[in-house]
Swiss-Prot record:
GO terms for molecular function: structural constituent of ribosome. It comes from Brassica napus. This is Large ribosomal subunit protein uL5m. Transmembrane segments: none annotated. Disulfide bonds: none annotated. It is found in: Mitochondrion. Coiled coil: none annotated. GO terms for biological process: translation.
Length: 185
């Protein structure tokens, strides 16, 4: 069974977020990008390279700037190099998923959101939630590289949509608020 069949048929009452094109091809409506930020101790630096979900997908990191210093990060975020010390914790950097990587991550999120107790907040044009590392059990591309994540508490995820208001966002993404047994948050 395709992973989204459960979400589409049993959980989200055919939520308008998902548009079934063929029995195995889905389109996520209104999503522009997914931003993922590891959540860990303030001074913790991941030394093993890229965020694991990006390893098989070749996604790019967004380089960020800090306040009035105007200094940008030029090294690989998550590599804990000395030239990054003193700016902002490496965990403050976000990873942005688009295209195929975003689609795969969306499939995993849609499949497990109804099973796990992640609080979800729908804002103007975004959906925000935090996931604990137990999410890795549902994402093989993460589980294969779990050593990177063994010291973090989870991920902060923001799904940016093309909506202009919260009223436009809510109907499409309401399935994220619905739990396995029909309960909503």
């Amino acid at each position: 069974m395709f992973p989204l069949n459960f979400h589409y048929e049993d959980v989200s009452r055919q939520d308008p977020l998902l548009n079934r094109i063929t029995p195995t091809l889905w389109k996520f409506l209104g999503s522009c990008e997914i931003r993922v930020v590891p959540n860990g101790p303030y001074n913790f630096i991941i030394k093993n390279g890229k965020l694991a979900m990006e390893i098989p997908r070749g996604q790019k990191f967004i380089q960020t700037q800090r306040g009035s210093t105007g200094k940008s990060f030029r090294s690989n975020p998550f590599l804990g190099s000395n030239k990054d010390k003193g700016y902002v914790s490496d965990l403050a950097r976000q990873s942005t998923l688009r295209g195929h990587g975003m689609s795969n991550f969306s499939v995993r999120i849609s499949t497990v959101m109804s099973l796990l107790d992640f609080p979800v907040e729908i804002r103007k044009n975004s959906i925000q939630f935090s996931m604990e590392t137990e999410f890795c059990e549902f994402a093989p591309q993460l589980q294969d590289h779990f050593e990177i994540f063994e010291h973090i508490r989870g991920f902060n995820v923001t799904i940016v949509t093309s909506a202009n208001t919260q009223d436009e966002t809510l109907p499409l993404w309401s399935g994220f608020l619905q739990k396995d047994e029909g309960e909503t948050q």
